[in-house]
Curated annotation (Swiss-Prot):
Reactions this protein catalyses: chorismate = 4-hydroxybenzoate + pyruvate
Residues annotated to bind substrate: R76, L113, E171
Function (record text): Removes the pyruvyl group from chorismate, with concomitant aromatization of the ring, to provide 4-hydroxybenzoate (4HB) for the ubiquinone pathway.
Pathway: Cofactor biosynthesis; ubiquinone biosynthesis
Family of the protein in this entry: Belongs to the UbiC family.
Gene Ontology biological process terms, A to Z: pyruvate biosynthetic process; ubiquinone biosynthetic process
Enzyme class: lyase
HAMAP family listed in its UniProt record: UbiC (MF_01632)
GO molecular function, one term: chorismate lyase activity
Principal place of residence: cytoplasm
Residue ranges of coiled coil: none
Name of the protein this chain belongs to: Probable chorismate pyruvate-lyase
Amino acid sequence: MITFPVSLSADWQCASLFSDLSSAEQEWLFEPHSLTAKLKSRSQCFSVKVLSEQEFELSAEQQQLLGCTQTTALNREVLLLCDNKPVVYAQSWLPASVNAANNKLHNMGERPLGDVIFQDPQLTRTDIEIARFNTQHSLQQLVAQLKLPSQSLLGRRSLFSLKDYKFLVCEVFLPGAYLY
């Protein structure tokens, strides 16, 4: 049984420190635009499966990244599926906001976050950070539950801002994803 939120505790590093990545890995990990749009372009049928959407405590690292004093945030965990095959596990951390304009990011159901945020011209993004998740990482419990082969995985994360509202998005490419 998987406990949410799935831990993505790892040695997140700036992309420049990953010199051993293949061209396919670089293409997918450093995609500056919507990963959702890129996945849609590579598949006949794209869908989102919500695994969990609930409020959780922020870690000290997450609070620091978000630059907030709040201790909780909405955590949304989804699978991005291409042709009914899970290819990306995504996790977003959305602090509560007093600004009603940002409520569109809460209660999205199976709508892809990328379809919403990349339509906003005020969206900004920090540099992408990369992490490796070895076969002993707790993320492998999800991989096993999905009946996918265990292998070292690559993930990326970025801090996004819409006006003054900051939120964190982490994406891990599952076994069989296009970048492997």
